[in-house]
Amino acid sequence: MQKLIERLDFGKIKARGEMPHFLEFQLNSYEDFLQTNMSPNKREEKGFELAFKEIFPIESSNGDVRLEYIGYELHEAEAPLNDELECKKRGKTYSNSLKVRLRLINKKMGNEIQESLVYFGEVPKMTDRATFIINGAERVVVSQLHRSPGVSFSKEVNTQTGKDLFSGKIIPYKGTWLEFETDKNDFLSVKIDRKKKVLATVFLKAVDFFKDNNEIRDYFLEVKELKLKALYKKYSKEPEELLNVLKQELDGSIVKEDILDEETGEFIAEAEAFINEEVINKLIENKVDKISYWYVGPESKLVANTLMNDTTLTEDEAVVEVFKKLRPGDQVTVDSARSLIRQMFFNPQRYDLEPVGRYKMNKRLKLDVPEEQISLTKEDVLGTIKYVIELNNGEQNVHTDDIDNLSNRRIRGVGELLLMQIKTGLAKMNKMVREKMTTQDIETVTPQSLLNTRPLNALIQDFFGSGQLSQFMDQSNPLAELTHKRRISALGPGGLSRERAGFEVRDVHDSHYGRICPIETPEGPNIGLIGSLATYAKINKYGFIETPYVKVENGVALVDDVRYLAADEEDGLFIAQADTKLDKNNKLQGLVVCRYGHEIVEIEPERVNYMDVSPKQVVSVSAGLIPFLEHDDANRALMGSNMQRQAVPLLKSEAPFIGTGLERKVAVDSGAVVTTKVSGKVTYVDGKKIIIEDKDKKEHIYRLLNYERSNQSMCLHQTPLVDLGDKVKAGDIIADGPATKLGDLSLGRNILMGFMPWEGYNYEDAILISDRLRKDDVFTSIHIEEYEIDARTTKLGDEEITREIPNVSESALRNLDENGVIMIGSEVGPGDILVGKTAPKGETEPPAEEKLLRAIFGEKARDVRDTSLTMPHGSKGVVVDILELSRENGDELKAGVNKSIRVLVAEKRKITVGDKMSGRHGNKGVVSRVLPAEDMPFLEDGTHLDVVLNPLGVPSRMNIGQVLEVHLGMAMRTLNGGTCIATPVFDGATEEQVKDYLEKQGYPRTGKVTLYDGRTGEKFDNKVTVGIMYMLKLHHLVEDKMHARAIGPYSLVTQQPLGGKAQFGGQRLGEMEVWALEAYGASNILQEMLTVKSDDITGRTKTYEAIIKGEAMPESDLPESFKVLLKEFQALALDIELCDEEDNVINVDEEIGIEETPTEYSPQYEIEMTGLHEIDEDAEDFEE
């Protein structure tokens, strides 16, 4: 067995607690949704099971028929579609059949019971790499970060008055939003669904929390009783003082009960009236004994004011008032209004907080409503109103919420995203079933006849096939795959949109610490909206991201007590860094630097609550692979982590000398390498498979990938690392994959490089390389392209795959087999035929004499045209595989397709001028020149450098990590014949250690050495920093971008050449280019450019003729775009005509006489003279 790479670790902090599996969340989310490993009757109420239980039982409106749900089963697809690779090859979906067991109870037929298993459709199956194979393509469903349901409070300042206005939003998972808010007039109102506004007290009566206004006052205001007799006595001599005392006590309060004059029966004060000076004077005059009232203090003014403006007195009036706001213009009755409001807030089908919303609500308002209660309760509403009132009163123990805090944002995984779709589909199905129950004949009804599962299947297919969060997997290399699955997007359905997202949402937040990486996010319009999960982060059952900490008690770190905390559990805690110094008893020493909210404080050890588990926990996998990350500017680190994902797997991979210790875990968790599931002995090994026999003599077969094509046309190939007879343990690595070497992720190569200018060839980040990198295939990669052709049935007959192609020389067919398909191993170049195909031409009725001749000499071969599959321009390679699918062999193909052939062509690409390369620190550049190795600068021992980079690329970019990497790489290159090390992020090798290792290996401590010019052999004036840098070749290869056109397709209307490489287009000569030619007065060139080289149809045909015959150039005709301009004038209803010198009208609309199949076609030049490209209109199936 080959020995795996062992790294010398420079990390000083021992990690406490295990790093979770990098794909844990994706795999668990889908398993929780499907519960495949549970038997149907033992499944928990979550995911699919929950969705079915919410919809069933379905009962007909008259109660005669009832459809009940028993359970669902998942059945594996039949061979060969139960294999991932086969699904990919055949363009099929890797899925399970969903069958649901239902019970139909028919009361009309004397409670007759029918049980049956109904096929509901296909549910895609997740591979163990957390991907889905949909129509042959591997896809990933990205997790979504969205606003958590629950309640949140916010503050705004009124611009006119400068007054603070507060609001409390109750946000359900699904249903109507409620927002209680104060306004400048001190009223408390509620917005229903963010637009319809009513007074809060009206709403409270409408939802039947209170019967009338008095009940509301009893709840919010304090009831007091004042005995006046004693006061009359006390202030009998001082009537002024009496008035002041009563004013102070009663002014602004509300009378609770009517106060009558006992003799006359007249009202002294009416119930529900505000008490003012006039009322107080009446009380004194009439010597009223006592008064009971609702006390209105500053804290209850809001409710009292609102009630004063509330014109509704009863629940019925309130219900009607709310209904009028919700449905203005609709006919209103009390019952219909009440029913609408009940449905809106108290029907779990329409209003659903979900357990997470209930959890947040209970936590925020300090309630203890049971978690099963997912609709709105009285406690929720009153708690929210009370909190808004407390905020308005400026109380100490209340605060508004930060919407960008991760305690208010949660993750929806694959399972939950799919569940949302499925609930929608089932709801549609439910509606259809109810309709069918009323229309179908009750005597013959069966579960199958009632169900129409099409809407459900359409939604599942939509979600996986074209949903915003289901993405074509980035398969450039194992790291790209892994980070794609760990990506977190704030976009997508129910999320933000790029245009609406402001700066705050995108910014790094203190709650991201250890949860979302502050570095890895795309550059461009999505910055900050798409993030990546941090290395140690997990996601809890409510969807909040948690990060692990070590518990600290009385200044001692309990290193075995690792706890995962969500963002809201971290509030008010002092959390120390992972590198805090501990003594041998794990006691914290000295003053400790801690995080406290978004502040950094220094405190005594006894006050510390928790401590980080590892310095790595802050960053994502991609950023965690950058050595000396702590010495790089964040902007460059962002580029570095994004560019590692674009690295092309090389033909000869090599693990980095300077790693971070994450390389092995990435290789294993991404599924790039093959690990064994059992312990045992290797009994068979070759390039295609490895067989391991366990202790019970049972054989386990591990198939290896052989030159498979990835989504990004990279080559997926696995190589065994074990030999026959080797003993292996479960979890051992037995085969290397693409971009891995001996079990470690290996995206690039260790390159000897120097920082120096060289003849201007590294100006502006350009890279000068040695031709050794080409000769020794150092940066050579294999790319596999796929070319596909279908033979269809057309109106004129069947297309045929054949070797007999009209007007094609024998040499062009030399590599085709007898069926017209290219042979594996053939070398092909641009224009070569891969698959010969002919299509029938439209045939006219032959004349009588031809019919006679045909009758005598037999049927003449029908006229066919060549529609073969050829290699596109600029492509070359070797045919490595051919996949044939045909109806004859029983393969499923699209409608109208009889045979489908796919040809895989592999191409070796060496590094070349124009290719993009980079290091791991965001130091990217383009190869500017490939220099012969002997001309490159060389060291004193004669070793030539491989790469020369510009030293000016370092200081302004502030990514000094690359310099440290180069120095340490130089030392490790010669240590024990090449040593791989790990320098973990934020805990790596120090500057001193780097210098010590350089010295140990006989290099100066500065890391600078004398270099000699390879051309003259002379010393360079100054010493140069030379060392080993790990460099990557990126996916932006010049061969994919280079493009040239002579004659090609034209746009139909303007007749100008198309644009872009994909369309084989030309270079656009825009208005600025015209100005440039005008500035030179180059009138003839300008005329050619605008006519015969572009859209003058007759002119370009005649010009070609003139060139062929060697004649003088003809004059140009009218450009087609001029005619388009005339048409545009006419479309504006302007009558515009074109006249010649004699004022004769020129008819622009005259058709130019071009035949359908151009005769001016010269096969030997492979040039088509006209812009009329025939479209294959005979093909029936235009869906593609």
Curated annotation (Swiss-Prot):
It comes from the Bacteria. One of its GO terms (cellular component) is DNA-directed RNA polymerase complex. Its EC number is 2.7.7.6. It is an enzyme of class 2 (transferase). One of its GO terms (molecular function) is DNA binding. Keywords: DNA-directed RNA polymerase, Nucleotidyltransferase, Transcription, Transferase. It catalyses: RNA(n) + a ribonucleoside 5'-triphosphate = RNA(n+1) + diphosphate. One of its GO terms (biological process) is DNA-templated transcription. PANTHER family: DNA-DIRECTED RNA POLYMERASE I SUBUNIT 2 (PTHR20856). NCBIfam families: PRK00405.1, rpoB. The RNAP catalytic core consists of 2 alpha, 1 beta, 1 beta' and 1 omega subunit. When a sigma factor is associated with the core the holoenzyme is formed, which can initiate transcription. Belongs to the RNA polymerase beta chain family. DNA-dependent RNA polymerase catalyzes the transcription of DNA into RNA using the four ribonucleoside triphosphates as substrates. This is DNA-directed RNA polymerase subunit beta.
